[in-house]
UniProtKB/Swiss-Prot annotation:
Statement: the UniProt record of this protein carries the keyword Thylakoid: no
Reactions that this protein is recorded to catalyse: pseudouridine(1915) in 23S rRNA + S-adenosyl-L-methionine = N(3)-methylpseudouridine(1915) in 23S rRNA + S-adenosyl-L-homocysteine + H(+)
HAMAP family for this protein: 23SrRNA_methyltr_H
Source organism of this protein record: Paracidovorax citrulli (strain AAC00-1) (Acidovorax citrulli)
UniProt entry tagged with the keyword S-adenosyl-L-methionine: yes
MF terms in GO: rRNA (pseudouridine-N3-)-methyltransferase activity
GO cellular component: cytoplasm
Domain of life: Bacteria
Pfam family, one: SPOUT_MTase
Protein name according to UniProt: Ribosomal RNA large subunit methyltransferase H
Keywords: Cytoplasm, Methyltransferase, rRNA processing, S-adenosyl-L-methionine, Transferase
Binding site for S-adenosyl-L-methionine: 72, 103, 122-127
Function: Specifically methylates the pseudouridine at position 1915 (m3Psi1915) in 23S rRNA.
Classification via CDD domains: RlmH-like (cd18081)
Amino acid sequence: MKLLIVAVGQRVPDWAQTAYEDYAKRFPPELKVELKAVKTEPRGSKTLETLYAAERERIEAAIPRGTRVVALDERGTSLTTKALAARLKDWQLGGDDVALVIGGPDGLDPAFRQAAHERIRLSDLTLPHAMVRVLLIEQLYRAWSVNAGHPYHRE
């Protein structure tokens, strides 16, 4: 199974890239993690609908057919660590690859959010996109560690 993290925005600070890579390399071979960063649409005088459409096209192009889509959204379901671990286990048993999608500065296109198989949120707080990448990969690793009985997660 593969976890594909699709993130709008190609530039992140070095500290965020280093932290992301540190967690990504911890996953076992049977649970591959891949990051696909897609270009943010230049803002200028474009309408929000135009921006959403351009970023949605890039996101959809980055996600292979048959992949389960999970949109990160402030209106999504809030999960505990145990609930995310259970969700990860379900995804693994289902056998499909999963794409977790992080939107751009204005979030995700409303139609894309609605079409996603699931919508989850990481926090009630507004977070910088670089931080979301790190928080997401860390929480996925923590969920894996719960399921594997690895000592990383402590109650």
